[in-house]
């Protein structure tokens, strides 16, 4: 009986897998076999941090700053709901990778026709380039704020971090995870310090985590709320997570997969909770520093930087803010380039040298950023940042819907298939995200 189940699971894929996802690091991180719970958990920790990076990239900053400065603490509940959706989707992505041994790109390539698979690849690449644009812009703005480096040169300098990724991956996947975790802690500490300096209203913060009807009835508030939701769940993260969970040397047996799914869920939930704290801190800072002082129209990251020192009365407030921004941009770079490699290998089975793949992704992100900066300066950069988030919104459903399809398919997942209650919730979330992003796209196009 068990053998029959295995055969049916194998037959649900149209073709054999050519190579594992991210083959150079696949199954490379040792898991102690007879260790106690916390030692095993420590070995599994890491992929969640790489995923959480996508939830605190520079693209998220703009929506949180706008929400806090214009509406105070009210939209904290939206950040909380977004995080709950993220935990659900990331748990599905990691389960897909652990159970099937395929990442989301490989699974999509196998399931769909070649023409449709090619379309999905193009959309995934556009999402990764859009993500990289946000990271390039965030890092360039941070370099400008900290060191006075012109934006156009800051954009070009960001190309150098490709070599950091290559060096770390050569040293071992754990090194990438350690750097990412260090930068995440840096961002959290920076915003923790900013919050202390801003003296927020704790009672208003607690109330902000309770959803208010005003979020739906106020069109301006609803638009920013949808922007927060749309910018939180990143499509490239679903491809990335389904791949990097396979870096662990868990037993590829029923019990081994069950254990890996459990530890992966703890890892990603913990890391996404840190991301929640960071995003909430950004909104709280904007509410305390700007909303309560009557500055309701803080247009972007640079405006927030300039206003922090005089508003909080501290000479280091803006510097700490810029350091956090630089850490955010660099962190996102590390994960975005890995995602690019995953989708190209998964959809097209093209295995470029890592340096070529990373240079390709970065060049495609830097070129539009350089052109816009040269022609329109800082205002153009902010517009490009917003446009990159629109591109991400358009692509998200093309990653979420296949993910829910595959994890709800008994032939593909066997006994690990989503139970009925999870299928219902997952499809409801997928439909909600699709409707949300159609609305966001329509609103953006009609307001041009």
Swiss-Prot record:
Region spans: Disordered: 1-20
Membrane topology: Multi-pass membrane protein
Main localization (coarse): membrane
Listed Basic and acidic residues bias regions: 1-10
Cellular compartments annotated: Cell membrane
InterPro entries named among the record's database cross-references: NRAMP_fam
Source superkingdom: Bacteria
Keyword Kinase included in the entry's annotation: no
GO molecular function: cadmium ion transmembrane transporter activity; manganese ion transmembrane transporter activity; metal ion binding; symporter activity
Keyword presence, Cell membrane: yes
GO cellular component: plasma membrane
Residue stretches spanning the membrane: 41-61, 69-89, 117-137, 147-167, 176-196, 215-235, 270-290, 307-327, 363-383, 384-404, 424-444
GO BP of this protein: iron ion transmembrane transport; manganese ion transport
Pfam family, one: Nramp
Keywords carried by this UniProt record: Cell membrane, Ion transport, Membrane, Symport, Transmembrane, Transmembrane helix, Transport
UniProt record similarity statement: Belongs to the NRAMP family.
PANTHER family assigned: NATURAL RESISTANCE-ASSOCIATED MACROPHAGE PROTEIN 2 (PTHR11706:SF33), SOLUTE CARRIER PROTEIN FAMILY 11 MEMBER (PTHR11706)
Functional summary from the UniProt entry: H(+)-stimulated, divalent metal cation uptake system.
Protein known as: Divalent metal cation transporter MntH
Organism for this UniProt entry: Listeria monocytogenes serovar 1/2a (strain ATCC BAA-679 / EGD-e)
């Amino acid at each position: 009986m068990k053998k029959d189940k295995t055969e049916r699971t194998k037959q649900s894929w149209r073709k054999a897998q050519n190579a594992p996802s991210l083959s150079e690091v696949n199954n490379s991180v040792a898991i102690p076999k007879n260790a106690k719970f916390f030692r095993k958990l420590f070995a599994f920790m890491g992929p969640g941090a790489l995923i959480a990076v996508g939830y605190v990239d520079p693209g998220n900053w703009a929506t949180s700053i706008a929400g806090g400065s214009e509406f105070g603490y009210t939209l904290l509940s939206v950040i909380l709901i977004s995080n709950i959706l993220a935990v659900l989707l990331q748990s599905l992505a990691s389960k897909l990778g652990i159970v099937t041994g395929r990442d989301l790109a490989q699974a999509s390539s196998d399931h769909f026709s070649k023409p449709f698979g090619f379309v999905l690849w193009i959309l995934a690449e556009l999402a990764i380039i859009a993500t990289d644009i946000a990271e390039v812009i965030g890092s360039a703005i941070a370099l400008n704020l900290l060191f006075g480096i012109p934006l156009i040169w800051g954009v070009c300098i960001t190309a150098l971090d490709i070599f950091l990724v290559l060096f770390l991956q050569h040293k071992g996947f754990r090194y990438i995870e350690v750097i990412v975790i260090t930068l995440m802690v840096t961002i959290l500490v920076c915003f923790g310090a900013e919050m202390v300096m801003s003296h927020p209203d704790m009672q208003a913060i607690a109330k902000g985590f309770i959803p208010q009807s005003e979020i739906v009835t106020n069109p301006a508030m609803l638009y920013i709320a949808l922007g927060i939701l749309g910018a939180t769940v990143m499509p490239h993260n679903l491809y990335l997570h389904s791949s990097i969970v396979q870096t662990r040397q868990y037993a590829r047996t029923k019990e081994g997969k069950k254990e890996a799914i459990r530890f992966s869920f703890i890892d990603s939930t913990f890391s996404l909770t840190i991301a929640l704290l960071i995003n909430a801190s950004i909104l709280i800072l904007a509410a305390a520093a700007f909303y309560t002082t009557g500055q309701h129209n803080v247009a972007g990251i640079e405006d927030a930087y300039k206003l922090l020192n005089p508003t909080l009365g501290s000479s280091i407030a803006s510097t700490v803010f810029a350091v956090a921004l630089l850490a955010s941009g660099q962190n996102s770079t590390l994960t975005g380039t890995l995602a690019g490699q995953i989708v190209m290998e998964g959809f097209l089975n093209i295995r470029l040298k890592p340096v070529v793949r990373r240079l390709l992704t970065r060049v495609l992100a830097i070129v539009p950023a350089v052109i816009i900066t040269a022609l329109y300066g800082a205002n153009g950069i902010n517009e490009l940042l917003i446009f990159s988030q629109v591109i991400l919104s358009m692509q998200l459903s093309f990653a979420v819907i296949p993910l829910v399809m595959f994890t709800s398919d008994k032939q593909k997942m066997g006994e690990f298939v989503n139970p009925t209650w999870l299928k219902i919730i997952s499809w409801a979330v997928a439909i909600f995200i699709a409707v949300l992003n159609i609305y966001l796209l329509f609103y953006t196009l009609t307001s041009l």
